Regions:
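P-loop/Walker A phosphate-binding loop and immediately adjacent motor/lid segment at beta-alpha junctions
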Residues: 134-156, 160
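Conserved G1/Walker A P-loop phosphate-binding module
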Residues: 1-121
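Conserved catalytic network of the ASCE P-loop NTPase/AAA+ motor domain
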Residues: 80-84, 89, 113-117, 128-131, ...
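Conserved nucleotide-binding/hydrolysis micro-motifs of P-loop NTPases
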Residues: 94-97, 127-131, 159-164, 188
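Canonical P-loop GTPase G-domain recognition
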Residues: 149-154, 160-188
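Generic enzyme active-site microenvironment
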Residues: 90, 124, 156-159
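Inter-motif core of Ras-like GTPase G domains
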Residues: 103-129, 140-148, 187
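Conserved ATPase-coupling elements of RecA-like P-loop NTPase cores
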Residues: 100-103, 131-136, 164-170
Length: 188
């Protein structure tokens, strides 16, 4: 029994060291990106909202995108060219879930860090989900908890092709009274 405890303790210590190493690597990469003065956009949203699919479409990447909870377990960053002269770093993040203690789950630590440090948040919403408004509120609560609620946000209403009747939306940009883009409707 004592030998088992010692082995378990050693494995836990080794895993903690690996986690610290990964955390340091991410911090180093983040500093390098920030030193390049390139704006960072983070895709945030409820789990299974289509963040990875949008990330793949925009960056021509091939990150895992499945119709299942937690298909994305780690953050991924790629350069996104907005024009020939302008590019940003786009980060795909782990989806949020209602009532999950985000601060207690180490898999979320990188996502929470990337989100809080982003210059712009692209809040991806699955408009086909019956509780999408509640999911938006859940994401907003997490953003407030981690101090990212003041980061400028653009709502990306996704999966509009699944809507019908009065809920149907056309793809395009939604603007406020001053003409500023506040949301976009897409299907990926």
């Amino acid at each position: 029994l004592e030998t088992d405890r010692r082995l378990i303790s050693q494995k836990i210590s080794a895993l903690k060291k690996q986690l610290q190493s990964v955390h340091k690597q991410r911090a180093t990469r983040r500093k390098a990106r920030m030193a390049g003065n390139m704006p960072t956009f983070a895709l945030v949203g409820y789990t299974n909202a289509g963040k990875s699919s949008l990330f793949n479409r925009l960056t021509k990447a091939d990150v895992l995108a499945k119709d299942q909870l937690f298909a994305t377990l780690d953050t991924t960053a790629r350069r996104l060219y907005l024009s020939a002269e302008v590019s940003v770093i786009l980060t795909d993040t782990v989806g949020f879930v209602r009532d999950l203690p985000h601060k207690l789950v180490s898999a979320f630590s990188a996502t929470l860090e990337e989100t809080a440090l982003a210059d712009v948040l692209l809040h991806v919403v699955d408009t086909g989900h019956p509780a999408f408004e509640r999911q938006m509120d859940d994401v907003d609560k997490v953003l407030e908890e981690i101090g990212a609620h003041e980061v400028p946000q653009l709502i990306v209403y996704n999966k509009i092709d699944l809507l019908s009747g009065e809920a149907a939306r056309a793809a395009g940009v939604l603007r406020d009274a001053a003409g500023r883009a506040v949301a976009v409707n897409v299907s990926v």
